[in-house]
């Protein structure tokens, strides 16, 4: 059995079609499930229901390639810290999400999610996602934040965290208004395919050296 995080050399399910496994992590309630549901099913969940482990499937075209995305939602709550690593096996890419209106979820990118992902998915590319960008203009949400002497997380703060965790990309989106949702998964697929190609080249190089 492959170790968690090993770059999976997934067999293509059909001529010219690639298959990728992408795991999405982040604090509970940060917008992971909404992002996945809007992208794969076209529906935005109006009520919050914590996920345990769910799998969604979608297709995306990258260049001339048809790519099947197997998208794994995970539970962000501490109760599932021991179970969540099971999702990481044979992952091609990890999306780390946070809520731009929840500074704690942003802090946890560095405190919790980056250490966990790099431990279980060594060498696997990451993409950082700032979710719920529509709420930056929500007066009630802003009032609540400022009452606690807090401010929304800015785009530049997101870029800074991306650099600190050495993620391949930083992207922002609003699942509710479908803003940048398709871009998130198209760009994630590009990053994963590029990493796969690099891993395959390195494998060939090692074989040549052995021969």
From Swiss-Prot:
GO terms of biological process kind: actin filament organization; cell migration; regulation of actin cytoskeleton organization; regulation of small GTPase mediated signal transduction; signal transduction; small GTPase-mediated signal transduction
Topology versus the membrane: Lipid-anchor
Lipid-attached positions, S-geranylgeranyl cysteine: 208
Record protein name field: Rho-related GTP-binding protein RhoF
Modification Cysteine methyl ester, positions: 208
Ranges spanned by the short sequence motif Effector region, renumbered to the chain: 48-56
Function per UniProt: Plasma membrane-associated small GTPase which cycles between an active GTP-bound and an inactive GDP-bound state. Causes the formation of thin, actin-rich surface projections called filopodia. Functions cooperatively with CDC42 and Rac to generate additional structures, increasing the diversity of actin-based morphology.
Pfam families xrefs: Ras (PF00071)
One GO CC term, this protein: plasma membrane
Lineage: superkingdom: Eukaryota
UniProt source species: Homo sapiens (Human)
Cellular localization per UniProt: Cell membrane; Cytoplasm, Cytoskeleton
């Amino acid at each position: 059995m492959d170790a968690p995080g090993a770059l999976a050399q997934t067999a293509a399910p059909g001529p010219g079609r690639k298959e990728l496994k992408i795991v999405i992590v982040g604090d509970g309630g940060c917008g992971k499930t909404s992002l996945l549901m809007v992208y794969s099913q076209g529906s935005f969940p109006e009520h919050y229901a914590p996920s345990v482990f769910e799998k969604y499937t979608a297709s995306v075209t990258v260049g001339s390639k048809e790519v099947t995305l197997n998208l794994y939602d995970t539970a962000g709550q501490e109760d599932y810290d021991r179970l969540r690593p099971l999702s990481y096996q044979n992952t091609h890419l990890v999306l780390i999400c946070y809520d731009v209106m929840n500074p704690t979820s942003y802090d946890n990118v560095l405190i919790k999610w980056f250490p966990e992902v790099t431990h279980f998915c060594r060498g696997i590319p990451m993409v950082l996602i700032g979710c719920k960008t529509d709420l930056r203009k929500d007066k009630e949400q802003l009032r609540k934040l400022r009452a606690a002497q807090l401010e929304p997380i800015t785009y530049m703060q997101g870029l800074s965290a991306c650099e600190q965790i050495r993620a391949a990309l930083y992207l922002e989106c609003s699942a509710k208004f479908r803003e940048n949702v398709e871009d998130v998964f198209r760009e994630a697929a590009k990053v994963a395919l590029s990493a796969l190609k690099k891993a395959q080249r390195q494998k060939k190089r090692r074989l040549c050296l052995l021969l």
